[in-house]
Regions:
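Domain-level signature for proteins that mediate thiol-based redox and metal-cofactor handling
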Residues: 3, 10-215
Length: 215
């Protein structure tokens, strides 16, 4: 969870002069993960929820994600509410990759093409929401509700600012299990975020929490 990152804008050149198209541009933000940039098209990306693509196989569910992986220099794509996070492969040069990403994003959003194969997110081949869950003890239902509310209202908005997301995976014997996605996945500072930031917050408001672990 970082301070607001500097932004840069990539204008659309050589496009038709319709007011909407002529005014469209892609803003970019750095993230705490040096391998990941956050791209903001100035409009909604996901109507609700988020989607994380960690492989070319998963990206087949989305023409845009697939096109980004097809550059050969991308190892992760994440769709947030109003942004797309792209993770570069080891050794990739962002000065060369960034223009390719911006061009693909502009082409997608200007053409208003469907984000997912089939037109929507239903049935796409990405891990479902509950996959990988550790689970909860039914006796802890009230505690779990408090934890989820804190994550939804205090943690996820801050993590989204960094180009990522966080998923609740379970609560067992005082331990909260969370999964990092997008820019936060594989980020060098993700452990510190979990331990110093999120763990401290949850332990402060929910005394039953003793630890937070990555799931």
């Amino acid at each position: 969870m970082s301070e607001p990152a500097p932004r840069s804008a990539a204008p659309l050149a050589g496009a038709p002069c319709a007011p909407y198209i002529a005014s469209m541009f892609i803003e970019t933000e750095t993230t705490p993960n040096p391998a990941t940039l956050k791209f903001l098209p100035g409009q909604r990306v996901m109507p609700s929820g988020t989607r994380d693509f960690a492989s070319p196989e998963e990206a087949e569910a989305s023409p845009l994600a697939q096109a980004l992986f097809d550059t050969g220099e991308v190892t992760g794509v994440f769709f947030g509410g109003d942004f797309v996070s792209v993770t570069a492969a080891p050794g990739a040069d962002w000065s060369q990759l960034k223009p390719q990403v911006v061009a693909l994003l502009l082409d997608h959003f200007v053409s208003q093409a469907p984000l997912f194969a089939g037109g929507d997110a239903s049935g796409i081949s990405v891990p479902p929401e509950g996959e990988g869950d550790v689970g909860d003890d039914p006796a802890d239902a009230e505690i779990v509700e408090q934890i989820k509310e804190l994550i939804e209202t205090r943690v996820r908005p801050a993590v989204a600012n960094d180009g990522g997301d966080i998923r609740y995976r379970g609560f067992r014997e005082g331990v909260v299990y969370l999964a990092m996605q997008g820019a936060c996945s594989g980020c060098p500072s993700s452990t510190a975020t979990l331990k110093q930031g999120i763990e401290g917050l949850l332990k402060h408001y929910v005394p039953e929490v003793t630890e937070v672990r990555a799931a």
